[in-house]
Amino acid sequence: MSATQAGYWYLASYPKSGNTWCRVFITELQRLAAESEPQELNLNRDLETGAIASSRHWLDDQMGVNSCDLSFAELDPLRGRAGESAWLFAEGERFHKVHDAFKSPDSRGRPVVSTAGCRGVVYIMRHPEDVVVSLSHFFSWPLERCVDYLLDPTAALVPGERNGGHQVRQHMGRWDQHVRSWADQSELPVLVMRYEDMLAKGAETFMALATFLGLPTEQGLVAQALANTSIDRLKKLEEQVGGFVEKPEGCERFFRSGRTGEGAEQLSLEQRKQLAKGLADVMERFDYGGVELG
């Protein structure tokens, strides 16, 4: 099968929901299937599943523009064109990370990612209470600010207008809006994976992932890839390379506890009520419990 026939996929998520874990698993499964004697995974060398959809260099290369010269209203409607060239289908770089919502307020009703040749999207989601705690450690923000962030309809990564950094603005909106933007869109096939199931039902959940993506589904391979990329193993691999390159400055480590339920332990009752009230419909839809609202 040619690279173009193989197509490509998106791995979409709200930040700190398990996207990197998913990418590492895909990398390891492919390595185990391809190498007779695979070497131990090096996080800073081997994790090359594809581009992040918000990469400024990648977008500029694909669209032939300087995105620093464009406003959000000018850039977002164009972003869906990126990837229409054959480069996106390069062998070995077929799984592209996305933190944007599927559409933005500035994209004029169009997706901010290319859908031409895309075979589907894996949407990874996590209990919003636990996302708050993980974001707090990742951004070095107080919990209160992270609660407000998940409830902010204008929330974005790299929010500055005409910012010249490595990534462009990624509109996410409220946590529930982000989930619905991907789970309910009808332009691409979608597999929704809950972080909680990745932990509690790993064999079943990652086998479903491999099947959806057309990756090797031999039970022994999937089990070995899962064992090699457990959260505890990833923490050790991060230590071995002296820190994961995707860890922001000021963050002690990228792979932290990986547990579920930290939000319920660390958030105040009022903060949990804020999330439950604001995100109730989507939390209930995906079986995420919260505090009772009296």
Regions flagged by a language model, labelled:
Residues P216, N228, D281-R285:
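Hydrophobic alpha-helical segments
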Residues Q219-A227, D287-G294:
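Short, flexible loop/turn segments with low-complexity composition
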Residues M1-V192, R256-G294:
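PAPS-dependent sulfotransferase catalytic domain
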Residues A101, H127, E196, N228-I231:
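Short, solvent-exposed coil/turn elements at secondary-structure transition points
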Residues G18-L32, V192-T217, A225, R233-L234:
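PAPS/PAP-binding and catalytic site of the sulfotransferase fold
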Residues T217-G220, S268:
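Structural helix-adjacent loops and short alpha-helical linkers that scaffold large soluble proteins
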Residues R174-Q177, E204, G250:
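Generic alpha-helical secondary structure signal
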Residues L226-K277:
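PAPS-dependent sulfotransferase catalytic core
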